[in-house]
Amino acid sequence: MTNSKAKNTGESQVAKRFILSAFLAAAGTTQAVEFENDIIEGNFDSTLSYGGSFRVDDPELSSIGRANGGTAYSVNGDDANLNYDSGLFSHVSKGTHDLELAFKELQEVSIFIRGTYFIDFENNRGDSPLSGSAKREVGREAEFLDAYVSYDLPSSVPVNIRFGNQVLSWGESTFIQNGINVINPIDVKKFRVPGSELREALRPVPLLSASVQLTDNLSLEGFYQFKHEEMEIDPAGSYFSTKDFVGAGGQYAMLGFGSLSQPNMSSWTDNPLAPFLDGVPAKLPTISNPRFNPALPPSAANAPFLPSNAGAIPRGKSNRASDSGQFGFAAHYFAEGLNDTEFGFYFLNYHSRLPVISAVTGRDIISELKPTFDALNGGIGQLKAGIGQVDTGLEQIAGGIVQVDAGLAQVNGAIAQLESTDPNNAGLAALKTEQATLTGQKQAFVAQQTGLTTQRAGLAAQLAGTEAQLSTLTASQSSLAQLYPGTARYIFEYPEDIQLYGISFNTEIGATGISVQGEVSYRNDVPLQVDDIELLIAGLTPSNPVLGNLGALNPAWNGVSMTQLGSQGFNSYVQGYRNFDVIQPQFTVTKLFGPTIGAEQWVLVGEVGATAVPDLPSKDKLRFDGPGTVLSGNAFAPQILAANGHATDRFESADSFADDFSWGYRLAARIDYMDVYGGVNLSPAVAFAHDVDGNTPLPLGNFLQDRKTVTVGVTATYQNSWQGSIKYTEYLGNESHNFMHDRDFLSAMVQYSF
């Protein structure tokens, strides 16, 4: 490679790492512990940190569902606000260690291992409101990250091969995600930890990767991935979570547009369907604080607790992607004749790292229970017939006993008379024989009577139990339809075989100190989320056909559906996504200033990007999910809701849903003041993100129109080992759909590297 190439590539990458570390990781330069013996040499880097984060203000009522005391039309995104008032929400000790080994006798081979761990004393406490699975994600964790073997192949051209868990970064993106750099999914929750570093948040994946430097100007790369890894999203109810039904701990999606709170996992009730249907749990968590749910029968509408499946759709088993079929190739060309510009060309075949939501409709409970009704009624008839037969037998036996008693009375009288008047009468013996015979007959009748009486009692008990079962089912017939949601489920899916084609560049503009880099990615068959409310309503059409055809409410609406997905059948799969081609250009400009305004240097970085989905249908054909939509986009929604008791509910405007084009920009700056006092360096920094226009379809979610984020902070560094920082983040704009708008926070940390 030429010096100009090294300079060009190095400065652009340094600028990227510099800004990312300033605002995402706050990492300092470490001085590794080096060691060696006769066989190996290596170094061991360690970074230990301690910090906390504080919520500035209490949550607003508009961020809390109506059933939980707020004004929001959903309880599916308010757990974080219920769990965290103003004050401390994270209190963390953390460590990350890097081990690098090289073999003296085999210099081509090296090993790299990275591990990290943390404990959040605030979220790991015993009385934390988080679920057990959510607490395991944000309360404490220890894991290995990178762990790979590197081999430099002895050849006429440099060839490097790596095998194991590793991070492979392609493309030229800086801040805006979902570009070319998709090989490694992100562990979002790691970014939330005070003192977090980028190296901890990128999830290494098991790869066989290779790179070859064919000439000074041309290099090739390739990889094959052995195991699919997914993006780790915020656990349900954690501070940065905005959806309670996704992530670790997310188990239910609630109906009722905010009128019912989530199931109370500490209070359980018998499942009335369990004795009669296979595949349903014996116990169910309850729903507390029912505000208003006209779909429930009047007797249950004001109950302090309701069965969870009266208003909650449970989460089903995820449909995960295959571990095979993911690979990619890249070529890099350094064009000295084009202003020392480096170009990159990329192809990847990969599976989605981001989840999309689909549904399986509920079971036809009434039809499924019909054989049970028939069997119970048939059983009752048979039991009653059996009791009737037993009663007939008892009547016959009772008649026989009466006849035997009459005969005994005559015989006993005759015996008594002879014994008193003629004791030696020859007929007395015959009378006593007849007396014994009649006594035996009576005893037999009594035994039969006892047996039949016991049999009748058993039949009567069976009849009472069967009639009780029938009574339970009959009494619940009016509400069986309301138990339907609990037999449905929503599922996460990770569609396969997304193909990405990309091109990138990076260069400098003369001697201006300005670096420019950018990329354009074209992806084929990207799964985009259909509006989840459309999916929800479609899932309810089997039990409420009027949602599929509004003509039953108003003849003028005949043929009009409440959902763009149309009517569905019972126990059927409803795909919640559609595949589209997605184009994403993004460009970054970096300006490195020398000594000025008393500072050693300062850096300004700006990135602008856009997401385009050329074939996305118009919103009157099919609406796709955008951040923060919690109501239907159907213009009929208010009238339908009013007819079903939700007179005050409204609907989402078309502007709320995903657009075919969206764009925004990111700005960041940092100033370095060296040796301010006693060898301490100070670096004030500011970052600004602005989503200018359009809403990016989920699960991509790059831009939400008019959303803004501002972060200001200062970092102090001492002897490249000690570092402390404090920063403040404010969320602004589009408050009705930006669920972070009231979660401004302050964080501080101290870090030691050695």
What are the residue ranges of the model-derived segments?
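Transmembrane beta-strands of outer-membrane beta-barrel pores
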Residues: 50-56, 117-121, 165-169, 226-230, ...
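Membrane-embedded beta-strand positions of outer-membrane beta-barrel proteins
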Residues: 44-46, 113, 161-163, 210, ...
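Short loop/turn motifs that connect adjacent beta-strands in outer-membrane beta-barrel proteins
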Residues: 32-44, 57-59, 99-111, 150-161, ...
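Outer membrane beta-barrel
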Residues: 106-256, 350, 664-666, 693-694, ...
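Detector for outer-membrane/organellar transmembrane beta-barrel domains
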Residues: 88-92, 348-350, 515, 523, ...
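Flexible glycine-rich, low-complexity coil/linker segments exposed to the extracellular/periplasmic environment
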Residues: 62-82, 235, 239-240, 247-320, ...
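Outer-membrane beta-barrel "beta-signal"
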Residues: 742-754
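Flexible, surface-exposed loop regions and adjacent strand-edge segments
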Residues: 61-67, 128-133, 178-183, 228, ...
